[in-house]
Structures are given as C-alpha cells and as structure tokens.
C-alpha cells in the first residue's frame, strides 16, 4: 500500500504529540522532586530548571559494538548496523527538538566515557559529582 501525504501528517502529528507528552511528564517529575532522567532530550527540556546537572555518557564505537554483540547476540556487523540506525534516530529526534546535535558539549556540564570506569564506576562517579553539585 502506498503512503499518501495524509499518512505522513498523521505520523508527524503523532510524533509531536508524543514529544509534548514526554516534555510534560519530564517537567512535572523535575518540579515535584529530585530525579534522574536518562535521554529523551531532558537536558534541553529542563534547560531553565535550577539546579540541574547535565551529563552525556558515551563510549567508543568498538566498546559499544562489543556490548551490543553480548546483549543482543549479534555479529559485529549486525551490532554496528544496529548502533548506526539507533544513533541516527536519536540524533534526528534530538536535532528536531533542540536544534543542536546530540552530545554537543556546549549543552552539557560533563561528558563521560563510560568505558574508562565501566557501568558501576561511571554511576559512582556521577553520584559523587551530584552530591557536590547539589550539596548533599
């Protein structure tokens, strides 16, 4: 079945509604209590919120490929394709919402390469930084 312009508009409208709902939920959570929000362009949505700690966590491509191979039982080639497609979707969504590139250091307080300390070590580092930033 071919898709007409009506289908395109419906999908765009649905995407915009989903983004609006996400923004509303994220703002309500942040207004209600201290919270950690992973992804969803929350750094942009909460840019006026104070205090805030905006962190971008990344790892080198080879580490990401190994993680996906292990977690999804993919070949290296399939893992790389999976990561590429996922990144494209995330970047496209973030750019449409914010006008900036995902991972842009100018919109972050910290960038952390999680391959240096691993998942637990990265979480511990963030916890320590948050305690200092929020004086806890």
List the predicted regions and their residue ranges:
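NTP-dependent small-molecule kinase module
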Residues: 27, 96-136
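Conserved phosphate-donor/acceptor-positioning beta-strand/loop module used by diverse small-molecule
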Residues: 48-71, 76-86
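Glycine-rich phosphate-binding loop used to anchor ATP phosphates in small-molecule kinases
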Residues: 10-47
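Short loop/helix-cap segments at secondary-structure boundaries that form the rim of catalytic
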Residues: 44-49, 103-105
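Single conserved hydrophobic/aromatic residue that forms the stacking wall/gate
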Residues: 1-9
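Long, contiguous binding/interaction regions
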Residues: 40, 44, 61-62, 74, ...
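Short glycine-/polar-rich loops that comprise or flank the Walker A/P-loop
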Residues: 5, 49-52, 107-108
């Amino acid at each position: 079945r071919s898709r007409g312009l009506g289908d395109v508009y419906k999908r765009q409208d649905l995407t915009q509604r989903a983004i609006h709902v996400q923004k509303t939920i994220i703002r309500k959570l942040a207004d209600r209590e201290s919270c950690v929000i992973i992804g969803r362009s929350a750094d942009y949505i909460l840019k006026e919120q104070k205090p805030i700690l905006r962190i971008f966590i990344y790892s080198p491509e080879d580490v990401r490929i190994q993680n996906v191979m292990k977690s999804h039982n993919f070949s290296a080639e399939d893992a790389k394709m999976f990561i590429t497609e996922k990144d494209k979707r995330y970047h496209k969504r973030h750019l449409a919402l914010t006008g900036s590139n995902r991972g842009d250091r100018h919109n972050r307080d910290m960038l952390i390469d999680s391959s240096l300390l691993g998942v637990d070590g990265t979480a511990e580092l963030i916890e320590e930084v948050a305690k200092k930033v929020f004086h806890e």
